[in-house]
């Protein structure tokens, strides 16, 4: 039987992309920025190695170990030295950033958690094989269509997940083996952590979003650890500190559009991260008790983003 991960990787690597950019070498920072921009526009990258080396002047460039390039008609442009972390378990472990939110709450962000091309392989698999649904939910007593696709995977025997009047169908981990590979990679960078459920979300464009909320359901306990892996188009992830009365009463705050509500918060009471393709964000401690978070609408986010949030149901 053909491995769906291998086949999707082959399809992606063989697809040309039109970029409208002239030939020439650019810096690593410019290359990464360009990659993120093109990913959000639905463009795909092809990975090349030493045997495919070339440059503007037509001379062999044997010093380049690994590059990504775009095709536009017969022109080629190389993005030099874009080398992803080989493996979360390698001796050259991916660098991480810790953000202390205060009062026992913190975040961990690993931008290059998974290798670049492998992340696209996972993206293709998830986009095509997950049974996505866009359910009707209830917000402030009104029924509306959830502004993103979703799916739920969990171990057997767990308390059912219910949010906004919606109870998703629970699929088995065995239904989607690549999810176990991603979970194993998380365990390698978060030793001692444990997760038994997964909520998947797919944002298909600029109008898809998630409003202000906290993942403070009782089934997760008072200090849940939530590991969030992102694939595809990068999107902003915004946190806002709850009001004192909201935090003490366990309320999740208002559910209004994140972009509008954000303007009412002070800079000290908010955090914003741009979650990259293949990145890992971990929320820990009392983050769900004291903070709410959102993924706002973004006019320039034309591509699809898939996000996996691993959780532990007690």
From Swiss-Prot:
Residue positions binding substrate: 132, 160-163, 216
Polar residues composition-biased segments: 1-28
Keyword annotations from UniProtKB, A to Z: Dioxygenase, DNA damage, DNA repair, Iron, Metal-binding, Nucleus, Oxidoreductase
Top-level class of the enzyme under EC nomenclature: oxidoreductase
Chief localization: nucleus
Tissues expressed in: Expressed ubiquitously, including in seedlings, leaves and flowers.
Region (Disordered): 1-75, 242-271
Residues where 2-oxoglutarate binds: 201-203, 305-311
InterPro entries: AlkB-like, AlkB-like_sf, ALKBH2, DUF4057, Oxoglu/Fe-dep_dioxygenase_dom
Ranges of Basic and acidic residues composition bias in the record: 57-75
Xref: Pfam families: 2OG-FeII_Oxy_2 (PF13532), DUF4057 (PF13266)
Disruption phenotype: Enhanced sensitivity to the methylating agent methylmethanesulphonate (MMS) leading to abnormal seedlings in presence of MMS.
Cofactor(s) the protein needs: Fe(2+)
One GO CC term on file: nucleus
Keyword check for Signal: no
Record-linked SUPFAM superfamilies: Clavaminate synthase-like
Residues binding Fe cation, per UniProt: 213, 215, 293
BP-aspect Gene Ontology terms: DNA alkylation repair; DNA repair
Listed EC numbers: 1.14.11.33
Reactions accelerated catalytically: a methylated nucleobase within DNA + 2-oxoglutarate + O2 = a nucleobase within DNA + formaldehyde + succinate + CO2
Cell location: Nucleus
Molecular function per GO: broad specificity oxidative DNA demethylase activity; DNA demethylase activity; metal ion binding
Function per UniProt: Dioxygenase that repairs alkylated DNA containing 1-methyladenine and 1-ethenoadenine by oxidative demethylation. Accepts double-stranded and single-stranded substrates, with a preference for dsDNA over ssDNA. Confers resistance to methylating agents such as methylmethanesulphonate (MMS).
Family per record: Belongs to the alkB family.
Stated name of the protein: DNA oxidative demethylase ALKBH2
Protein's organism: Arabidopsis thaliana (Mouse-ear cress)
